[in-house]
Amino acid sequence: MRDRLAMSDREQVPDRDSSTGAVASGSVDTRRLRVALLSYRSKVHSGGQGVYIRHLSRELAALGHDVEVISGPPYPELDPGPRLTRLPSLDLYREPDPFRIPHWREFRSAIDILEFAMMCTASFPEPLTFSLRSWRVLVNRPRESWPDIVHDNQTLGYGMLLTRKAGLPVVATVHHPIAVDRRLELAAATLRKQIPIRRWYSFLRMQGRVARRLPAVLTVSQSSRADIITSFEVQADRMTVVPLGVAHDVFVPPSQPRVPGRIVATASADVPLKGLVPLLEATASLRADRPVELVVVGTVREGGATAAAIERLGLTASVRFVADLSEADLVALFQSAQVAVVPSLYEGFSLPAVEVMACATPLVATTAGALPEVVGPDGEAALHVPPGDPAALAAAIGRVLDDDGLAGRLGAAGRARVLQRYTWRVVAERTAAWYHACLAEGGVTC
Protein backbone atom coordinates (compact mmCIF):
# COMPACT_ATOMS: atom_id res chain seq x y z
CA MET A 1 0.00 0.00 0.00
CA ARG A 2 2.76 2.40 0.90
CA ASP A 3 4.50 1.61 -2.39
CA ARG A 4 1.44 2.86 -4.27
CA LEU A 5 1.62 6.11 -2.32
CA ALA A 6 5.35 6.71 -2.49
CA MET A 7 6.47 10.32 -2.25
CA SER A 8 8.13 10.14 -5.66
CA ASP A 9 4.77 9.47 -7.33
CA ARG A 10 2.83 12.39 -5.92
CA GLU A 11 2.57 16.08 -6.57
CA GLN A 12 2.88 18.75 -3.88
CA VAL A 13 0.49 18.13 -0.97
CA PRO A 14 -1.08 21.29 0.51
CA ASP A 15 0.27 22.52 3.81
CA ARG A 16 -1.90 22.82 6.89
CA ASP A 17 -1.92 25.82 9.25
CA SER A 18 -1.13 24.19 12.60
CA SER A 19 -2.78 27.03 14.52
CA THR A 20 -6.19 26.65 12.84
CA GLY A 21 -6.12 23.30 11.05
CA ALA A 22 -7.04 24.97 7.76
CA VAL A 23 -5.79 23.39 4.54
CA ALA A 24 -3.81 25.84 2.43
CA SER A 25 -4.42 26.16 -1.28
CA GLY A 26 -1.90 24.88 -3.79
CA SER A 27 -1.25 21.97 -6.13
CA VAL A 28 -2.63 18.72 -4.78
CA ASP A 29 -2.27 15.00 -5.40
CA THR A 30 -5.08 13.92 -7.71
CA ARG A 31 -4.35 10.20 -7.93
CA ARG A 32 -7.27 7.83 -7.53
CA LEU A 33 -7.76 6.38 -4.06
CA ARG A 34 -9.90 3.54 -2.77
CA VAL A 35 -11.89 5.12 0.05
CA ALA A 36 -14.02 3.32 2.63
CA LEU A 37 -16.42 5.85 4.15
CA LEU A 38 -17.89 4.53 7.42
CA SER A 39 -21.00 5.76 9.22
CA TYR A 40 -22.96 3.87 11.85
CA ARG A 41 -26.27 5.44 10.75
CA SER A 42 -26.58 7.42 7.57
CA LYS A 43 -30.16 7.97 6.45
CA VAL A 44 -30.63 11.57 5.30
CA HIS A 45 -33.60 12.03 7.63
CA SER A 46 -31.49 10.97 10.65
CA GLY A 47 -29.70 14.31 10.70
CA GLY A 48 -26.79 16.12 9.13
CA GLN A 49 -24.47 13.10 9.11
CA GLY A 50 -26.64 11.36 6.51
CA VAL A 51 -26.46 14.44 4.31
CA TYR A 52 -22.67 14.51 4.74
CA ILE A 53 -22.28 10.88 3.69
CA ARG A 54 -24.51 11.25 0.64
CA HIS A 55 -22.90 14.34 -0.83
CA LEU A 56 -19.28 13.69 0.14
CA SER A 57 -19.39 10.16 -1.31
CA ARG A 58 -20.92 11.40 -4.57
CA GLU A 59 -18.39 14.19 -5.07
CA LEU A 60 -15.40 12.02 -4.14
CA ALA A 61 -16.57 9.51 -6.75
CA ALA A 62 -17.01 12.34 -9.28
CA LEU A 63 -13.36 13.27 -8.68
CA GLY A 64 -12.41 9.75 -9.80
CA HIS A 65 -11.98 8.00 -6.44
CA ASP A 66 -13.35 4.51 -5.78
CA VAL A 67 -15.77 5.14 -2.91
CA GLU A 68 -17.45 2.50 -0.78
CA VAL A 69 -19.93 3.62 1.89
CA ILE A 70 -20.17 1.14 4.75
CA SER A 71 -23.19 1.88 6.93
CA GLY A 72 -25.45 0.44 9.55
CA PRO A 73 -29.20 1.08 9.52
CA PRO A 74 -30.90 3.38 8.77
CA TYR A 75 -29.05 3.22 5.48
CA PRO A 76 -28.12 6.23 3.35
CA GLU A 77 -29.66 7.44 0.13
CA LEU A 78 -26.70 7.49 -2.25
CA ASP A 79 -26.41 9.12 -5.65
CA PRO A 80 -24.82 7.30 -8.61
CA GLY A 81 -21.07 6.81 -8.20
CA PRO A 82 -20.34 5.39 -4.73
CA ARG A 83 -21.42 1.88 -3.77
CA LEU A 84 -23.11 0.85 -0.54
CA THR A 85 -22.17 -2.00 1.77
CA ARG A 86 -24.90 -2.60 4.33
CA LEU A 87 -23.93 -3.85 7.79
CA PRO A 88 -27.14 -5.18 9.36
CA SER A 89 -27.62 -4.76 13.08
CA LEU A 90 -30.46 -5.54 15.46
CA ASP A 91 -31.69 -2.00 14.69
CA LEU A 92 -33.00 -1.63 18.23
CA TYR A 93 -34.07 2.00 17.87
CA ARG A 94 -36.01 1.74 14.62
CA GLU A 95 -39.39 3.35 14.23
CA PRO A 96 -42.12 2.65 15.13
CA ASP A 97 -40.82 0.28 17.84
CA PRO A 98 -37.66 1.74 19.44
CA PHE A 99 -36.10 -0.22 22.32
CA ARG A 100 -37.69 -3.36 20.92
CA ILE A 101 -37.00 -6.90 22.14
CA PRO A 102 -35.64 -8.90 19.18
CA HIS A 103 -36.63 -12.50 18.49
CA TRP A 104 -33.93 -14.98 19.46
CA ARG A 105 -33.53 -15.99 15.81
CA GLU A 106 -32.29 -12.46 15.04
CA PHE A 107 -29.10 -12.96 17.03
CA ARG A 108 -26.36 -13.92 14.56
CA SER A 109 -23.13 -13.15 16.43
CA ALA A 110 -21.58 -12.16 19.73
CA ILE A 111 -21.74 -8.54 18.55
CA ASP A 112 -25.54 -8.82 18.38
CA ILE A 113 -25.63 -10.12 21.95
CA LEU A 114 -23.42 -7.22 23.06
CA GLU A 115 -25.70 -4.75 21.26
CA PHE A 116 -28.81 -6.02 23.03
CA ALA A 117 -27.10 -6.23 26.43
CA MET A 118 -25.93 -2.62 26.20
CA MET A 119 -29.43 -1.43 25.30
CA CYS A 120 -30.80 -3.29 28.32
CA THR A 121 -28.44 -1.31 30.57
CA ALA A 122 -29.66 2.00 29.02
CA SER A 123 -26.40 2.50 27.08
CA PHE A 124 -26.24 3.45 23.40
CA PRO A 125 -24.40 0.56 21.71
CA GLU A 126 -24.32 1.55 18.03
CA PRO A 127 -20.92 3.34 17.86
CA LEU A 128 -19.18 0.37 19.47
CA THR A 129 -21.05 -2.43 17.71
CA PHE A 130 -20.89 -0.83 14.27
CA SER A 131 -17.15 -0.28 14.65
CA LEU A 132 -16.69 -3.96 15.50
CA ARG A 133 -18.79 -5.07 12.53
CA SER A 134 -16.91 -2.80 10.13
CA TRP A 135 -13.55 -4.03 11.49
CA ARG A 136 -14.63 -7.63 10.94
CA VAL A 137 -15.80 -6.95 7.37
CA LEU A 138 -12.72 -4.97 6.34
CA VAL A 139 -9.96 -7.16 7.75
CA ASN A 140 -11.55 -10.38 6.46
CA ARG A 141 -11.22 -9.18 2.87
CA PRO A 142 -8.20 -10.16 0.77
CA ARG A 143 -5.43 -7.69 1.50
CA GLU A 144 -5.15 -6.69 -2.15
CA SER A 145 -8.75 -5.39 -2.02
CA TRP A 146 -8.25 -3.26 1.10
CA PRO A 147 -9.04 0.45 0.76
CA ASP A 148 -6.22 2.96 0.66
CA ILE A 149 -7.85 4.85 3.51
CA VAL A 150 -10.72 4.27 5.95
CA HIS A 151 -12.65 7.46 6.77
CA ASP A 152 -14.86 7.12 9.84
CA ASN A 153 -17.79 9.50 10.23
CA GLN A 154 -17.95 10.09 14.00
CA THR A 155 -18.34 6.44 15.03
CA LEU A 156 -15.13 6.51 17.08
CA GLY A 157 -15.64 2.98 18.36
CA TYR A 158 -12.93 0.62 19.54
CA GLY A 159 -13.25 -1.32 16.29
CA MET A 160 -11.54 1.60 14.56
CA LEU A 161 -8.43 0.97 16.64
CA LEU A 162 -8.58 -2.74 15.78
CA THR A 163 -8.81 -1.79 12.11
CA ARG A 164 -5.68 0.36 12.46
CA LYS A 165 -3.89 -2.42 14.31
CA ALA A 166 -4.60 -4.72 11.37
CA GLY A 167 -2.71 -2.29 9.11
CA LEU A 168 -5.45 -0.20 7.53
CA PRO A 169 -5.07 3.60 7.51
CA VAL A 170 -7.92 5.10 9.59
CA VAL A 171 -8.90 8.77 9.94
CA ALA A 172 -12.15 10.33 11.16
CA THR A 173 -14.54 13.23 10.88
CA VAL A 174 -15.89 14.57 14.17
CA HIS A 175 -18.66 17.08 13.50
CA HIS A 176 -18.70 18.19 17.12
CA PRO A 177 -18.03 16.50 20.47
CA ILE A 178 -21.29 14.97 21.72
CA ALA A 179 -20.19 15.97 25.23
CA VAL A 180 -21.91 19.30 24.49
CA ASP A 181 -25.23 17.52 23.89
CA ARG A 182 -24.83 15.61 27.15
CA ARG A 183 -24.07 18.74 29.15
CA LEU A 184 -27.15 20.56 27.87
CA GLU A 185 -29.44 17.57 28.42
CA LEU A 186 -28.18 17.10 31.97
CA ALA A 187 -28.69 20.78 32.73
CA ALA A 188 -32.33 20.56 31.61
CA ALA A 189 -33.11 17.24 33.37
CA THR A 190 -34.38 16.46 36.84
CA LEU A 191 -32.06 14.56 39.16
CA ARG A 192 -33.99 11.34 38.54
CA LYS A 193 -33.65 11.65 34.77
CA GLN A 194 -29.94 12.47 34.92
CA ILE A 195 -29.03 8.84 35.70
CA PRO A 196 -30.34 7.34 32.42
CA ILE A 197 -28.94 10.31 30.48
CA ARG A 198 -25.46 9.59 31.86
CA ARG A 199 -25.82 5.91 30.96
CA TRP A 200 -26.98 6.73 27.43
CA TYR A 201 -23.95 8.95 26.84
CA SER A 202 -21.48 6.46 28.34
CA PHE A 203 -20.09 5.87 24.82
CA LEU A 204 -18.44 9.31 25.03
CA ARG A 205 -15.52 7.99 27.06
CA MET A 206 -14.80 5.49 24.28
CA GLN A 207 -15.10 8.18 21.60
CA GLY A 208 -12.60 10.38 23.39
CA ARG A 209 -10.12 7.53 23.76
CA VAL A 210 -10.40 6.58 20.09
CA ALA A 211 -10.18 10.18 18.85
CA ARG A 212 -6.97 10.72 20.85
CA ARG A 213 -5.41 7.65 19.24
CA LEU A 214 -6.24 8.49 15.64
CA PRO A 215 -3.44 10.25 13.74
CA ALA A 216 -5.74 12.66 11.89
CA VAL A 217 -9.16 14.13 12.67
CA LEU A 218 -11.26 16.29 10.35
CA THR A 219 -13.90 18.68 11.63
CA VAL A 220 -16.26 21.21 10.11
CA SER A 221 -15.54 24.53 11.84
CA GLN A 222 -12.95 26.32 13.94
CA SER A 223 -15.46 26.31 16.80
CA SER A 224 -15.77 22.52 16.66
CA ARG A 225 -12.00 22.19 16.41
CA ALA A 226 -11.55 24.11 19.66
CA ASP A 227 -14.28 22.08 21.39
CA ILE A 228 -12.81 18.75 20.24
CA ILE A 229 -9.36 19.75 21.47
CA THR A 230 -10.90 20.64 24.85
CA SER A 231 -13.45 17.82 25.24
CA PHE A 232 -11.57 14.91 23.63
CA GLU A 233 -8.03 16.20 24.30
CA VAL A 234 -7.02 15.64 20.68
CA GLN A 235 -3.68 17.21 19.80
CA ALA A 236 -4.16 20.42 17.84
CA ASP A 237 -1.69 19.44 15.12
CA ARG A 238 -3.82 16.39 14.28
CA MET A 239 -6.90 18.51 13.55
CA THR A 240 -7.94 19.79 10.12
CA VAL A 241 -10.97 21.97 9.30
CA VAL A 242 -13.04 21.48 6.14
CA PRO A 243 -16.47 23.19 6.31
CA LEU A 244 -19.55 21.40 5.02
CA GLY A 245 -21.35 22.12 1.77
CA VAL A 246 -24.82 22.45 0.33
CA ALA A 247 -26.42 21.27 -2.91
CA HIS A 248 -26.55 24.83 -4.24
CA ASP A 249 -28.17 23.74 -7.50
CA VAL A 250 -31.04 22.10 -5.56
CA PHE A 251 -31.48 24.57 -2.70
CA VAL A 252 -32.25 27.61 -4.84
CA PRO A 253 -34.25 30.84 -4.43
CA PRO A 254 -38.03 30.48 -4.87
CA SER A 255 -39.97 31.19 -8.03
CA GLN A 256 -43.21 31.66 -6.06
CA PRO A 257 -44.11 34.24 -3.37
CA ARG A 258 -43.23 33.33 0.20
CA VAL A 259 -45.98 32.55 2.71
CA PRO A 260 -46.58 35.66 4.86
CA GLY A 261 -45.79 35.11 8.52
CA ARG A 262 -44.27 31.66 8.02
CA ILE A 263 -41.28 30.92 10.25
CA VAL A 264 -39.28 27.75 9.57
CA ALA A 265 -36.79 25.97 11.83
CA THR A 266 -35.09 22.57 11.78
CA ALA A 267 -34.46 20.24 14.72
CA SER A 268 -32.96 16.83 13.97
CA ALA A 269 -33.91 15.82 17.53
CA ASP A 270 -36.23 17.21 20.18
CA VAL A 271 -33.48 17.96 22.69
CA PRO A 272 -32.54 21.11 24.66
CA LEU A 273 -29.51 21.72 22.42
CA LYS A 274 -31.81 22.68 19.52
CA GLY A 275 -33.34 25.62 21.42
CA LEU A 276 -36.96 24.91 20.49
CA VAL A 277 -38.49 26.14 23.75
CA PRO A 278 -37.01 29.67 23.44
CA LEU A 279 -38.22 29.74 19.82
CA LEU A 280 -41.72 28.73 20.91
CA GLU A 281 -41.72 31.50 23.51
CA ALA A 282 -40.62 33.97 20.84
CA THR A 283 -43.39 32.75 18.54
CA ALA A 284 -45.98 33.25 21.28
CA SER A 285 -44.72 36.81 21.77
CA LEU A 286 -44.93 37.55 18.04
CA ARG A 287 -48.48 36.22 17.84
CA ALA A 288 -49.64 38.98 20.18
CA ASP A 289 -49.60 41.52 17.33
CA ARG A 290 -49.38 39.58 14.05
CA PRO A 291 -50.41 36.26 12.47
CA VAL A 292 -47.44 33.88 12.37
CA GLU A 293 -47.00 30.18 11.74
CA LEU A 294 -44.02 28.14 12.93
CA VAL A 295 -43.11 25.04 10.92
CA VAL A 296 -40.42 22.83 12.47
CA VAL A 297 -38.67 20.15 10.44
CA GLY A 298 -38.47 17.32 12.96
CA THR A 299 -40.62 15.47 15.46
CA VAL A 300 -41.84 16.46 18.89
CA ARG A 301 -41.19 14.09 21.79
CA GLU A 302 -44.39 13.12 23.54
CA GLY A 303 -44.35 14.35 27.13
CA GLY A 304 -41.17 16.37 26.60
CA ALA A 305 -40.38 20.02 27.27
CA THR A 306 -41.28 21.09 23.73
CA ALA A 307 -44.72 19.50 23.84
CA ALA A 308 -45.33 21.03 27.27
CA ALA A 309 -44.30 24.49 26.02
CA ILE A 310 -46.66 24.27 23.04
CA GLU A 311 -49.54 23.48 25.39
CA ARG A 312 -48.53 26.09 27.98
CA LEU A 313 -48.19 28.86 25.40
CA GLY A 314 -51.40 28.01 23.55
CA LEU A 315 -49.58 27.33 20.28
CA THR A 316 -51.28 24.10 19.23
CA ALA A 317 -52.90 25.73 16.19
CA SER A 318 -49.84 27.81 15.27
CA VAL A 319 -47.00 25.27 15.36
CA ARG A 320 -46.57 22.37 12.96
CA PHE A 321 -43.93 19.62 12.97
CA VAL A 322 -43.11 17.87 9.68
CA ALA A 323 -40.77 14.88 9.35
CA ASP A 324 -39.26 12.55 6.75
CA LEU A 325 -39.53 15.16 4.01
CA SER A 326 -38.14 14.43 0.58
CA GLU A 327 -35.38 16.74 -0.55
CA ALA A 328 -37.79 18.46 -2.93
CA ASP A 329 -40.32 19.03 -0.14
CA LEU A 330 -37.61 20.37 2.17
CA VAL A 331 -36.46 22.83 -0.48
CA ALA A 332 -40.05 23.93 -1.10
CA LEU A 333 -40.58 24.51 2.62
CA PHE A 334 -37.42 26.60 2.97
CA GLN A 335 -38.41 28.60 -0.10
CA SER A 336 -41.87 29.26 1.34
CA ALA A 337 -40.62 30.78 4.60
CA GLN A 338 -40.66 34.51 5.18
CA VAL A 339 -37.88 33.94 7.71
CA ALA A 340 -35.85 30.93 8.89
CA VAL A 341 -34.46 30.53 12.40
CA VAL A 342 -31.62 28.50 13.88
CA PRO A 343 -32.32 28.86 17.63
CA SER A 344 -29.74 26.30 18.80
CA LEU A 345 -27.86 26.49 22.08
CA TYR A 346 -24.89 24.90 20.28
CA GLU A 347 -23.99 23.96 16.71
CA GLY A 348 -20.78 22.47 15.39
CA PHE A 349 -21.72 23.76 11.93
CA SER A 350 -25.48 23.73 11.02
CA LEU A 351 -26.34 22.39 7.60
CA PRO A 352 -29.87 23.84 7.83
CA ALA A 353 -28.35 27.32 8.10
CA VAL A 354 -26.50 27.04 4.80
CA GLU A 355 -29.45 25.28 3.15
CA VAL A 356 -31.84 28.12 3.94
CA MET A 357 -29.22 30.69 2.92
CA ALA A 358 -28.87 28.86 -0.40
CA CYS A 359 -32.63 29.40 -0.85
CA ALA A 360 -32.09 33.15 -0.26
CA THR A 361 -34.34 32.86 2.79
CA PRO A 362 -33.56 35.54 5.40
CA LEU A 363 -32.05 33.97 8.49
CA VAL A 364 -32.02 34.64 12.22
CA ALA A 365 -29.41 32.58 14.09
CA THR A 366 -28.01 32.45 17.59
CA THR A 367 -24.36 33.09 18.34
CA ALA A 368 -23.93 29.58 19.75
CA GLY A 369 -20.97 27.44 18.72
CA ALA A 370 -19.97 27.75 15.08
CA LEU A 371 -23.03 29.67 13.89
CA PRO A 372 -21.37 33.13 13.62
CA GLU A 373 -18.48 31.49 11.76
CA VAL A 374 -20.90 29.81 9.33
CA VAL A 375 -23.44 32.59 8.68
CA GLY A 376 -21.02 35.52 8.80
CA PRO A 377 -21.07 38.85 10.69
CA ASP A 378 -24.28 40.13 12.25
CA GLY A 379 -26.48 41.90 9.74
CA GLU A 380 -24.73 40.70 6.57
CA ALA A 381 -26.31 37.35 5.69
CA ALA A 382 -28.15 36.79 8.99
CA LEU A 383 -29.23 38.54 12.16
CA HIS A 384 -27.50 37.32 15.33
CA VAL A 385 -29.20 36.79 18.70
CA PRO A 386 -27.89 35.39 22.00
CA PRO A 387 -28.74 31.71 22.54
CA GLY A 388 -31.67 30.97 24.83
CA ASP A 389 -33.10 34.51 24.64
CA PRO A 390 -36.78 34.48 23.54
CA ALA A 391 -37.10 38.28 23.61
CA ALA A 392 -34.09 38.76 21.33
CA LEU A 393 -35.39 36.05 18.99
CA ALA A 394 -38.81 37.69 18.78
CA ALA A 395 -37.29 41.11 18.11
CA ALA A 396 -35.01 39.84 15.32
CA ILE A 397 -37.73 37.75 13.67
CA GLY A 398 -40.08 40.73 13.87
CA ARG A 399 -37.52 42.97 12.16
CA VAL A 400 -37.33 40.60 9.20
CA LEU A 401 -41.10 40.16 8.99
CA ASP A 402 -41.65 43.93 9.03
CA ASP A 403 -38.87 45.04 6.66
CA ASP A 404 -38.97 43.63 3.13
CA GLY A 405 -35.79 45.50 2.23
CA LEU A 406 -33.86 43.93 5.11
CA ALA A 407 -35.25 40.49 4.27
CA GLY A 408 -34.19 40.84 0.64
CA ARG A 409 -30.67 41.99 1.54
CA LEU A 410 -30.16 39.15 4.02
CA GLY A 411 -31.44 36.56 1.55
CA ALA A 412 -29.26 37.75 -1.33
CA ALA A 413 -26.17 37.94 0.88
CA GLY A 414 -26.86 34.46 2.25
CA ARG A 415 -27.07 32.97 -1.23
CA ALA A 416 -23.86 34.72 -2.26
CA ARG A 417 -22.05 33.45 0.86
CA VAL A 418 -23.07 29.86 0.08
CA LEU A 419 -21.89 30.04 -3.52
CA GLN A 420 -18.55 31.45 -2.40
CA ARG A 421 -17.85 29.10 0.50
CA TYR A 422 -20.08 26.05 0.80
CA THR A 423 -20.21 23.69 -2.19
CA TRP A 424 -19.84 19.92 -1.92
CA ARG A 425 -17.31 19.79 -4.75
CA VAL A 426 -14.97 22.02 -2.73
CA VAL A 427 -15.58 19.85 0.35
CA ALA A 428 -14.62 16.73 -1.61
CA GLU A 429 -11.52 18.33 -3.14
CA ARG A 430 -10.27 19.48 0.26
CA THR A 431 -11.10 16.13 1.87
CA ALA A 432 -9.22 14.23 -0.85
CA ALA A 433 -6.24 16.57 -0.35
CA TRP A 434 -6.42 15.73 3.36
CA TYR A 435 -6.37 11.99 2.56
CA HIS A 436 -3.22 12.37 0.48
CA ALA A 437 -1.57 14.55 3.12
CA CYS A 438 -2.35 12.00 5.85
CA LEU A 439 -0.96 9.13 3.79
CA ALA A 440 2.14 11.10 2.82
CA GLU A 441 2.88 11.91 6.46
CA GLY A 442 3.21 8.18 7.07
CA GLY A 443 1.50 8.06 10.45
CA VAL A 444 -1.90 6.72 9.54
CA THR A 445 -1.29 3.16 10.72
CA CYS A 446 1.03 3.77 13.66
Feature-to-residue mapping (PLM):
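Acceptor-binding helix/loop patch of EC 2.4 sugar-transfer enzymes
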Residues: P98-A122, R164-G208
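Short alpha-helical donor nucleotide-sugar binding micro-motif in glycosyltransferases
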Residues: D324, A332-A337
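Nucleotide-activated donor-binding/catalytic signature segment of Leloir-type glycosyltransferases, i.e.
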Residues: T306-A328
